[in-house]
């Protein structure tokens, strides 16, 4: 049976990739309307794919083309939905753990069937109720959509010729002793140093940033402001004034306060706080 399985899987994967984009949006034609939904043309391999009534358009007819998300339901049937998931295959997204079992943790990704993070794909043991930044992909051995918190292995390790000062899209991935690890343009890993952060940021947040340095080892440093001088200080000053107004003109912090308390309130280092307040 093992030999048969090893022969079947590559064919299955090939068919899957060629016919339907699992975990992504597909444009499929309505071929039949029934009481419990509509059937869509999934091609020669998949045949008719059900779009259940609860997510199907109220008015549609045979021959209409619908943009649908394709995944496996709880009974491992290929199924379509017009509900928008929190992420599709190839995305990084922040999701909450809603359950655990002997196979892994389950995330709420906006669909009826929760998204599995297998134990081997957990950077640390995942806890119900907590949110994690995950990468969504198709497991090639099972052909199931799963997620992983082991983000680094899905990022490009090949150095890219970014230009210094180039504007890039960032996703905040993880807090470290030095600052925050971020994902650059959905592709590369970089760091923003704590003493160069002048605003509160959270895991999973999407930000616009800029390339500050590309080191000899290929590692990337980013900043959130185009200039690393007065502009950041001005932004921090505005934030401090806003906090003062919200608290009747006084704050329970000073340049003698604990650095972590200053960071919690203003998202900056104690050094930058002192520089701003004088």
What residue spans do the PLM features occupy?
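Single-stranded RNA-binding regions, centering on S1/OB-family and related RNA-binding modules
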Residues: 3, 9-278
């Amino acid at each position: 049976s093992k030999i048969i399985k090893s022969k079947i899987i590559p064919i299955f994967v090939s068919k899957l990739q060629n016919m339907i984009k699992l975990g992504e949006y597909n444009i499929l034609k309505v071929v039949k309307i029934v009481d419990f939904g509509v059937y869509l043309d999934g091609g020669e391999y998949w045949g008719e794919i059900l779009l259940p009534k609860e997510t199907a358009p109220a008015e549609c007819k045979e021959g209409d083309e619908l943009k649908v998300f394709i995944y496996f339901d709880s009974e491992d049937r290929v199924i379509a939905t017009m509900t928008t998931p929190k992420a599709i295959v190839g995305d990084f997204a922040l999701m909450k753990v809603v359950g655990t079992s002997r196979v892994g943790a389950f995330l709420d990704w906006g669909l009826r069937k929760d998204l599995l993070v297998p134990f081997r794909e957990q950077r640390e043991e995942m806890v119900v109720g907590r949110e994690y930044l995950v990468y969504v992909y198709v497991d090639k051995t099972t052909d199931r959509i799963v997620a992983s918190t082991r983000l680094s292995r899905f990022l490009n390790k090949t150095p890219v010729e970014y230009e210094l000062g180039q504007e890039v899209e960032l996703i905040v991935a993880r807090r470290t002793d030095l600052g925050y690890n971020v994902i650059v343009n959905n592709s590369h890993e970089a760091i923003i140093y704590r003493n160069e952060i002048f605003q509160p940021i959270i895991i999973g947040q999407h930000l616009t940033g800029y390339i500050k340095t590309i080191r000899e080892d290929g590692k990337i440093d980013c900043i959130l402001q185009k200039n690393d001088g007065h502009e950041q200080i001005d932004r921090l000053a505005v934030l401090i004034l806003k906090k003062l107004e919200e608290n009747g003109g006084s704050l329970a912090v000073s340049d003698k306060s604990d650095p972590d308390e200053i960071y919690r309130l203003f998202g900056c280092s104690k050094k930058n706080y002192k520089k701003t307040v004088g």
